[in-house]
Amino acid sequence: MNTNDFDFELPEELIAQTPLEQRDASKLLVIDPVTREMTDTHFDHIIDQLNPGDALVMNNTRVLPARLYGEKTDTHGHVEFLLLKNTQGDQWEVLAKPAKRLKVGAKVSFGDGRLTATVTKELDHGGRIVEFSYDGIFLEVLESLGEMPLPPYIHEKLEDRDRYQTVYAKENGSAAAPTAGLHFTPELLQKIEAKGVKLVYLTLHVGLGTFRPVSVDNVDEHEMHSEFYTLSQEAADTLNSVKAAGGRIVAVGTTSIRTLETIGNKYDGQLQADSGWTNIFIKPGYQFTVVDAFSTNFHLPKSTLVMLVSAFAGREFVLEAYKHAVQERYRFFSFGDAMFVTRPSEK
C-alpha cells in the first residue's frame, strides 16, 4: 500500500478554524459500507444510529494547557516547550524550540520564575527530558501559565479553552483533544442514556504524534507513536456484557478504537481491566475484534487516521465519502464535522 492511495483533494477553506457555537449542531455524514449508502444529517441525530443495548465508548482524557513560553535563565533567549508526557515525578518529555540551545543542565524560567525547568536529557527531533521546579500544585501552575496546544492547521486564537475539551474530560494528560467527542453535549448524552445505551469511559492520552504526517511511501514502513491508555474493570465488564447480549460496541473516535482493539487483541476479543502503552497501527487488512461502529471527524489526507477508517469501511468507499463531504462543504479536522460508520456485516 502506498501512502498516496489515501490522498484526496481538500480546499483549505474547509479546514474549520473555530468550533461551532452549539457543539451538536455540526453536520454528520452516516455511511454504510455494506449498502454504500451515505446520509447527510446533523450530529444531534446520532441517537438515531444507536440501539437500546448498545454501548457508547468515549475517551475521557483531558487536554493540558501544554504549551509554555519562557526564557533561558542565562541568556534570556526565548524558549517554547510543548509538554508531551509525564515520565516520572516532576520529569516530563517536552518538544523544545529552539532545541539546539538547550543542552543538558540548561535552565528555563516561566512566568517570572513561578515555574523553572532543568534539561536532564537530550532526545531526537527536538525532544528533551526536563525536571520542573515550582511552588504549590503543578497542574494549577500549568493552568495559569500554559496555553492550549492547538493543532498546526488551526491559526485562529481559541477564545474559550473549554471548547477544546470534551464535556466529559476528566483525566489530565493529553497534548491534543480526542476531537470526535467535542460534538457531544450533556443533554445529548442524557438522551442517549435514556434510550437504553450504556455510556462507558476509557482513557487514552493523545500524544503529538497524532498530527505527525506519514513520511514514508510504503504504508507498512510507518512507525506509530505510543500513547498511554487505561480501561477499568467496571468498563470492561459492562462492554463484555453488552457484547454477550448482542449489543454493539460503538466507539467515539479513533483513540477509543485503538484502545479497545489493543486490549481485545491481548485477550482474544474479550476486554479486561488493562493499562499500558499502545502503538497499534490499524490499516486496511486489519480484522476488528471489538468495535462494531464508530463516530469520527474528517481527517487529514494521507494520515494514519484515514487509513484506520479505511480498514473499517474500505478505502475506495471512504474516499468516495470524503469526496461527498467536500462537495457538500463539510468542515474538516479538529473543529469540523463528523462521520458515523457502521461495520460491514460480513466481518
Swiss-Prot record:
* One matching Pfam family: Queuosine_synth
**Metabolic or biological pathway, per its Swiss-Prot or TrEMBL entry:** tRNA modification; tRNA-queuosine biosynthesis
Q: Which reaction does it catalyse?
A: 7-aminomethyl-7-carbaguanosine(34) in tRNA + S-adenosyl-L-methionine = epoxyqueuosine(34) in tRNA + adenine + L-methionine + 2 H(+)
| Keyword Protease included in the entry's annotation | no
Q: Looking at the keywords, is Cytoplasm present?
A: yes
Return the GO cellular component terms, semicolon-separated.
cytoplasm
Oligomer status and interactors: Monomer.
Q: What does this protein do?
A: Transfers and isomerizes the ribose moiety from AdoMet to the 7-aminomethyl group of 7-deazaguanine (preQ1-tRNA) to give epoxyqueuosine (oQ-tRNA).
**Recorded family membership:** Belongs to the QueA family.
Which NCBIfam families does its entry note?
A: PRK00147.1, queA
Protein name as catalogued: S-adenosylmethionine:tRNA ribosyltransferase-isomerase
Which species expresses this protein natively? Streptococcus thermophilus (strain ATCC BAA-491 / LMD-9)
Tell me the gene name.
Answer: queA
